[in-house]
């Protein structure tokens, strides 16, 4: 069977879209959005990171991340502190850590539902294939 690449690409995008919609909808129950929770997750993984690093980690432009981070500061979820030179470091506040932790619970539930139709071996194979096309080693840990 020959697989059309555009159909394959669309199938990957459709699965991602379904997952993102479910996450965004359920994260609302803890007062967050997927974009906000993803930013908190990136800051939690790399406390003190710059906006440039966090923008790359969350697949956003620096400008978009800066706007989002500003909203997170106003909400009391993130603290910005001067770093080396002109660098601004980002840290979670205790409330930001609480929302991040609650979001992990939501994400585990949503992702369990999204992947429930796959056996563990199929999940491992899917992860390996996605990492292969991403150019990452299969055994590399990451988000």
PLM features per residue range, with description:
Residues 30-36, 64, 93, 116-120:
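Short helix-coil-helix linker/hinge
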Residues 51-52, 63, 88:
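Residues within helix-turn-helix
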């Amino acid at each position: 069977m020959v697989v059309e690449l555009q159909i394959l690409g669309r199938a990957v995008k459709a699965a991602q879209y379904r997952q993102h919609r479910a996450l965004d909808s359920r994260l609302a129950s803890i007062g967050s959005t997927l974009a906000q929770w993803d930013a908190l997750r990136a800051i939690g993984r790399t406390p003190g990171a710059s906006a440039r690093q966090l923008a790359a980690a969350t697949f956003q432009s620096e400008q978009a991340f800066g706007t989002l981070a500003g909203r997170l500061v106003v909400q009391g979820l993130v603290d910005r502190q001067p770093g080396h030179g002109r660098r601004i470091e980002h840290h979670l506040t205790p409330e930001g850590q609480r929302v991040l932790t609650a979001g992990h619970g939501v994400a585990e539930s949503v992702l369990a539902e999204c992947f429930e139709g796959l056996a563990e071996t199929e999940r491992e194979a899917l992860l390996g294939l996605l990492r292969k096309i991403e150019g990452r080693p299969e055994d590399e840990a990451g988000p």
